[in-house]
A protein has these predicted regions:
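Zn-dependent metallo-beta-lactamase
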Residues: 8-28, 32-95, 234, 238-245, ...
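Beta-strand-turn-beta hairpins that frame and shape the catalytic cleft
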Residues: 54-59, 92-97, 174-181, 199-203
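Metallo-beta-lactamase
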Residues: 192-259
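Active-site neighborhood of phospho(di)ester-bond hydrolases with catalytic His/Asp-centered motifs
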Residues: 100-103, 126-134, 150-152, 184-187, ...
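Active-site HxH/HxHxD metal-binding segment of metal-dependent hydrolases
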Residues: 79, 83-84, 97, 102-175
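Soluble or luminal CAZymes and related metallo-dependent hydrolases
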Residues: 83, 106-109, 187, 227-235
Length: 259
């Protein structure tokens, strides 16, 4: 790999080592670098939910998102103070390279971040999946013109009605590429869908805005524009039952349960 720093790879030993020394919260590196096996009594003793056999070989966070306003930082729900960017992830496996929620509207920036985190170019991406219809989760979709564009049926219909995309988004249900599960996660929007997969024995959920950030997750609270707060809390409980790793819509990934 070009450059002196390894891309973030879903190696369980490396992942757990960084957790054990408290580096997970760092926004500088989205996925583990390298290190020794974790010591006894660390996160390695957790019972993992994922399967060790999976077509998914690696996953990389491309952009770590942020909210336009964050009540847990003392900001008012009624007023945005910055532009929102969503967390974007690439999942690679046997026969596919999938990007989830491409977030950057600027083509040069999107290409640069993709290369910086994976060494890939937009033309290398074979498919894109969008969790829901809010624009900050698909503003970068058009940069992946050679990929298949996919979303749950109601999300695909909403995206196609915008008339802002150069081609149609296809409906996808249940599963992609055998081992990527599309799971309904309503609350933020009623049609919201997340993605779950196994990688090296860990179950990973790309939550989208069903989990805005780790603070919202901890409080089981939806974002200010959530359409159903009670349903959102139930959805987070469901994700908790499925995931070892949660990738939220506007934050770095974290381990479940969150300590």
């Amino acid at each position: 790999m070009a450059g002196g720093e390894q891309s973030g790879r879903c190696s369980r030993a490396r992942f757990l080592t960084r957790l054990s020394v408290g580096i997970l919260a760092s926004a500088a590196t989205a996925v583990p670098a390298s290190g020794a096996e974790p010591a006894a009594g660390t996160a390695s003793s957790r019972p993992w939910k994922g399967r060790t056999i999976s077509k998914v070989k690696r996953w990389d966070v491309i952009t770590i998102g942020n909210l336009s306003r964050n009540r847990y930082w003392g900001e008012n729900d009624a007023k945005g103070v910055r532009s929102a960017i969503c967390t974007c992830t690439v999942v690679q496996g046997e026969g596919f390279r999938l990007i989830v929620d491409p977030s950057l509207a600027n083509a040069e920036e999107m290409s640069k971040e993709l290369d910086r985190r994976t060494g890939l170019q937009p033309r290398d991406i074979t498919a894109a999946f969008i969790t829901h219809e809010h624009g900050d989760h698909w503003f970068g979709l058009a940069h992946f013109s050679e990929a298949r564009w996919l979303a749950a049926p109601d999300v695909a219909a909403a995206l196609n009605k915008t008339n802002k995309l150069p081609k149609s988004v296809e409906s996808a249900t249940d599963r992609l590429f055998d081992d990527l599960e599309i799971i309904p996660t309503p609350g933020h929007t009623l049609s919201h869908h997340s993605m779950r997969f196994d990688c090296e024995g860990m179950s990973v959920v790309l939550a989208g805005d069903s989990v805005p950030t780790r603070d919202f997750w901890r409080e089981r609270r939806g974002y200010y524009n959530c359409v159903d707060f009670e349903l959102s809390a139930k959805t987070m409980d469901r994700i908790a039952s499925l995931a070892d790793v949660v990738v939220p819509g506007h934050d770095n990934y974290f381990l479940n349960p969150l300590k």
